[in-house]
Amino acid sequence: MALATRTDRNPSRTVQHPSKRDRQPKRDRQSKRDRQPKRDRQVSVPRLFWRSTVGKKTVMAVSGLIMLGYLVAHMMGNLKIFFGADEFNAYGHWLRTMGAPVLHYSWGLWLVRVVLLLAVVGHAVSAYQLSRRDIKARPAKYVHKRPRSSYATRTMRWGGVIVGLFVVWHLLDLTTLTVNENAQAGHPYENVVATFSTWYGNAVYIVAMLAVGLHIRHGFWSAAQTLGVGSATRERILRAAANGLALVLTAGFVSVPVAVMTGWVS
């Protein structure tokens, strides 16, 4: 049996056998330690940025601005319906041929859809994670009375849900023509008139556009705060711009179903 220690002629002196680790050269141990991966070095800068609260707010703000730009362009395209069927149908054809001849048929439209989808996903995920982080940071309810917030602020989350459900309905209605009974492929003007000739089509669209307006009013101002306002004067200007932009977009979108209901567009 091998013993860990042995005693020589001097009983008071005990000699210990060196362990396997002690017999290993110090240089080899150091090189082995250096070869081990360090977790801190594996985390990339984009991942650190995304994990931070500022990063999530920035993603939410930038994606919101992308969607806002799309809404402005979409509203301007919708208003072409007031110039007649030929003008509106030509606009629908241009959407599928934009970028030609460099891009193939509908490639430009699909590129816009992909960018918009990424913006929607980034906006929704960052909003959800920020909400969960805020709840975890304040698990207990405050006893004192919370400051009064605007109606748009209190309904921000539900407004996002309403808009998300409307997007699904809108695609099934005017893109895939699944729920539009009187739809005709290749006739966007007639399809819009058919949709807004029903009470439920008008109800769904108008409620959704009101939710969009409230969401834009609060979201535009929140994005400005996240990206930096700068001064009190600029703050007042951006707040007025948020209110005006929400009003113009809501009125522009709602004007189309109202025009169909009143017979202005038929």
Model-based region annotation:
Residues 2-266:
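Membrane-embedded alpha-helical bundles that constitute the cytochrome b-like, heme-associated redox core
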